[in-house]
């Protein structure tokens, strides 16, 4: 269904002479990504509203989307499974952040571990996202800066909203775990 909608949108652009026919596959793929992203984000937002956890949800989405856009990480084989993993990750972050309060020491620990993991693993290579070495270095630097920024925001929020601060903390952990899972899969594939 996703492919069908993306194909219809792309054909409409071709008919309106907005894009060339040679760009058909690229635009179909782009629309598939956009629709999948909007679906997952909307689903998470709806859950946040229903569960009355809007601030935690916004914190999750900001950290999860911004950081992953520069670090890469686990990619599901289907758009449905991608939405499922995103929703599952969100649910786990929401659940854990509702029960566990984080301290400055937790943040300092995740800051050190996170920077090391980002230096070693980020950004993850993806076959559909070709990058040159300079872009990879740029993405690595941006991901480290974003990570540090979110840690700083999380620390600051411990004084205002511990639940939102915890949501940021556990979203950072989730991002690192998904980055690590993807990297382990790449290493296993290279060994095979």
Model segments located where?
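Hydrophobic transmembrane alpha-helices
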Residues: 7, 11-56
